[in-house]
Regions:
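Conserved catalytic/switch belt of AAA+ P-loop NTPases
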Residues: 103, 128-145
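P-loop/Walker A NTP-binding region and its immediately flanking N-terminal helices
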Residues: 1-119, 124-125, 142
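Charged, glycine-rich active-site and insertion segments that engage polyanionic ligands
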Residues: 1-50, 68-71, 139-141, 148-306, ...
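Catalytic acidic motif of RecA-like/P-loop NTPases
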Residues: 117-123, 128-135, 151
């Protein structure tokens, strides 16, 4: 089983990506895009791993087990730079640092690979710094950019990149993959539905009962708000559980990555790490610290998006549209809530939540935003 098998994509799209990653001379710049739940970020990372995979047969690249793949996935490969930001915008200094790294020749792999997420946060003044490097990179450098959609990226940048637009997997396809991985059919369908087609989230829900219970109950907090104090309590509980969920996800992944890296380097757990290898371990630790903060903000954003599914279910019941509910497990509670509010009120809540989600993506004060939103449900 290779890394490519993780991705739930149309067969033609997946085959094309595999061929492109193993080509003698791949395109120098790529733009991976997809809506929330689409695997564009994971696909870009797997593409990077395949570019630096050590398998001699091009058809086998992206194996997921060689040193090249493992160190790309955990961020410790010396020829791979994985840039993500918590800031509202990507700074000129960030861009200049990436441009400098792009000039370095590969030290162990075939390519110097720069994976730049959050490209939609790049203002025009920053894009001007990157433009030349992306348009005419050194022959050994490949740029991989990610964003929610092509239109989120300045035209001067996206016009220089080969586009890879990936769809959100169908819920049935995500469920089928979970079943193939040994998950019971009903649980697989339930997890895939709650995850809204996000395969990574669905897998966690299917294998972690505590995470599944949090997902089933957390978005329903809004239905029990009766006072300002209960609104604050709901906001605090949502934030606390999102932080806990993120910490658990990061811890499990961090330990797995450290174990894999030590095995690749030939180091037994607890043994002294030689100075020549310590830099790779430190690089992994630094990457994990940066990623932990991002996981926390992404988890909180996802928690608020899950509340959005509750509001849409309520609106579905109020309008009697007959559409399937995303939170079918809570139909009775949703019906009771729908009966004591109006469709107009629910629509106002949906619109307010869209504003909150937009501001959360710009690193605004999450607690203030969520407390304000919860306060809307006070009767």
């Amino acid at each position: 089983m290779s890394l490519w098998d993780e991705l739930i994509l149309p067969a033609g799209t997946l085959d094309q990506l595999r061929r492109d990653a193993s080509a003698e001379r791949p395109t120098h710049a790529w733009l991976f895009t997809g809506a929330a739940g689409a695997p564009h970020r994971r696909a870009a990372l797997i593409f990077a791993a395949a570019l630096l995979c050590e398998q001699p047969d091009p058809a086998d690249r992206g194996c997921g087990t060689c040193k090249g793949c493992v160190t790309v996935l955990n961020g410790s490969h010396s020829d791979f730079t994985h840039f993500r930001t918590e800031a509202v915008s990507i700074s000129i200094d960030d861009a200049r640092e990436l441009v400098m790294k792009a000039q370095d020749r590969p030290s162990v792999g075939r390519w110097r690979v720069i994976l730049m997420e959050d490209t939609e946060r790049m203002p025009e003044r920053t894009s001007n710094v990157l433009l030349k490097a992306i348009e005419e990179p050194p022959p050994h450098t490949i740029w991989l950019l990610t964003a929610p959609s092509p239109t989120d990226v300045l035209v001067t940048i996206r016009s220089r990149c080969r586009p890879v637009q990936l769809p959100v997997p169908a819920i049935a396809d995500v469920a089928a993959k979970l079943v193939a991985d040994g998950v019971e059919d009903a649980l697989a369908r339930h997890a895939a539905t709650l995850a809204q087609g996000d395969a990574e989230v669905a897998a966690r829900l299917a294998h972690d009962p505590a995470a599944l219970q949090r997902r089933e109950t957390l978005p329903l907090l809004i239905m029990n708000i009766r006072s300002i104090s209960s609104a604050y309590a709901a906001a605090d509980r949502l934030i606390t559980l999102a932080e806990q969920d993120a910490a658990e996800a990061a811890a499990a992944r961090d330990e797995k990555e450290r174990t894999e890296l030590l095995a690749i380097l030939g180091i037994t757990e607890g043994a002294r790490i030689s100075p020549s290898l310590r830099s790779q371990v430190r690089r992994l630790e630094d990457e994990q610290k940066r990623r932990a903060k991002r996981i926390q903000s992404d988890t909180l954003l996802r928690s608020m998006t899950e509340i959005q599914t509750v509001l849409r279910d309520v609106l579905t019941l109020q309008l009697n549209s007959g559409s399937a509910l995303m939170n079918e497990h809570a139909r009775d509670a949703l019906a009771e809530f729908a009966a004591r509010t109006s469709a107009a009120q629910t629509l106002e809540h949906v619109q307010a939540l869209e504003v909150v989600l937009g501001r959360l993506r710009t690193n605004a004060n999450a607690r203030l935003l969520i407390e304000g939103f919860m306060g809307r449900f006070v009767h």
